[in-house]
Amino acid sequence: MLETMRRHGITLAIFAALTTGLTAVVNSLTKSTIAEQAALQHKSLLDQVIPPALYDNDIQNECYLVNANALGNNLPHRLYLARKNGHPVAAALESTAPDGYSGAIQLLVGADFSGKVLGVRVTEHHETPGLGDKIETRISNWINVFSGKTITSNHDQHWAVKKDGGEFDQFTGATITPRAVVNSVKRTALYLQTIPEHLSSLESCGEKS
């Protein structure tokens, strides 16, 4: 009887060890796959705001943290630097439009250092479905209107929605959302023009504790 119980105990222990080991292996493989997919999605997002033909460096690994009121709050924002033949040519910068209709709108703005916007994407928002959510590419192509636009002065009156005398369309029944995005992209593109002179002093994302 004791021998039988001992054998059963050993069998259960071996089974438990095998199960634990298998679970650990599966979790490890799953985490690796999830991380790889996240990296691919992030690279795809960066390529939507900075055309890949413009740079030849590993843009995801050339990440810096910047703080500026122009970016919508006093929190660190990630900046991804694009280089061509070693020379900085553009950057993708996280930015916040704090004055959306339903709260802050998170953006990723790509621009060169002369004020030309290369692309903009909304990464997070809580705007009203059917109204303010037209800032999403899956809803409309409105956000693409920024590509190719240039801003060199904070006093450029073209950089406003049409209701405010500018050139950007607002949405029917929703002016606050596009106004917030236009103003945020404008501030971010202007701020990016100051980056080259401060590159040597920027904090690497990897240095953040």
UniProtKB/Swiss-Prot annotation:
Compartment(s) where it occurs, according to its Swiss-Prot or TrEMBL record: Cell inner membrane
Stored InterPro entries: FMN-bd, Ion_transpt_RnfG/RsxG
Enzyme Commission number: 7.-.-.-
Cofactor(s) essential for the protein: FMN
One Pfam match: FMN_bind
Keywords: Cell inner membrane, Cell membrane, Electron transport, Flavoprotein, FMN, Membrane, Phosphoprotein, Translocase, Transmembrane, Transmembrane helix, Transport
Protein name: Ion-translocating oxidoreductase complex subunit G
Source organism: Photorhabdus laumondii subsp. laumondii (strain DSM 15139 / CIP 105565 / TT01)
Source lineage: Bacteria, Pseudomonadati, Pseudomonadota, Gammaproteobacteria, Enterobacterales
